[in-house]
Amino acid sequence: MFLLHEYDIFWTFLIIASLIPILAFSISGLLAPVSEGPEKLSSYESGIEPMGGAWVQFRIRYYMFALVFVVFDVETVFLYPWAMSFDVLGVSVFIEALIFVLILVVGLVYAWRKGALEWS
């Protein structure tokens, strides 16, 4: 039978974990001195005078590489726990993981054919 009080620890932890950052940002916003000036609006490069403009437009290739990296990084996050418990889960979970990997391979082939991985 589903009893709501079994999850009291979870809800307590969730509320505390949500309140700590909210309180930290609120207190720092109330206690921090407000000082606006021209230096506050200038860009910062490790204590050195900035060279050039602060707003630089990056080429789309950087974003494509970042997107492909994130996709395969997420794949690793999903597949590692599956690999650690492979012997317990059974054949059906193996087939699901295989479908997941095949979908990612199709995405990789698509990105490759579109030239997203070429740096010319």
Swiss-Prot record:
Function (record text): NDH shuttles electrons from NAD(P)H:plastoquinone, via FMN and iron-sulfur (Fe-S) centers, to quinones in the photosynthetic chain and possibly in a chloroplast respiratory chain. The immediate electron acceptor for the enzyme in this species is believed to be plastoquinone. Couples the redox reaction to proton translocation, and thus conserves the redox energy in a proton gradient.
UniProt keyword Oxidoreductase, yes or no: no
Sample GO molecular function, one term: quinone binding
Sorted UniProt keywords: Chloroplast, Membrane, NAD, NADP, Plastid, Plastoquinone, Quinone, Thylakoid, Translocase, Transmembrane, Transmembrane helix, Transport
Quaternary state and interactors: NDH is composed of at least 16 different subunits, 5 of which are encoded in the nucleus.
Signal peptide coordinates: none
Broad EC category: translocase
Listed InterPro entries: NAD(P)H_OxRDtase_bac/plastid, NADH_UbQ/plastoQ_OxRdtase_su3, NDAH_ubi_oxred_su3_sf
Subcellular locations according to the entry: Plastid, Chloroplast thylakoid membrane
Family to which this protein belongs: Belongs to the complex I subunit 3 family.
GO cellular component, one term: NADH dehydrogenase complex
Organism: Hordeum vulgare
Transmembrane segments: 9-29, 64-84, 88-108
One of the GO biological process terms: photosynthesis, light reaction
EC number, as in UniProt: 7.1.1.-
Main location per the UniProt record: plastid
Gene field: ndhC
Catalytic activity: a plastoquinone + NADH + (n+1) H(+)(in) = a plastoquinol + NAD(+) + n H(+)(out); a plastoquinone + NADPH + (n+1) H(+)(in) = a plastoquinol + NADP(+) + n H(+)(out)
Membrane topology: Multi-pass membrane protein
Lineage per the UniProt record: Eukaryota, Viridiplantae, Streptophyta, Embryophyta, Tracheophyta
Name of the protein: NAD(P)H-quinone oxidoreductase subunit 3, chloroplastic
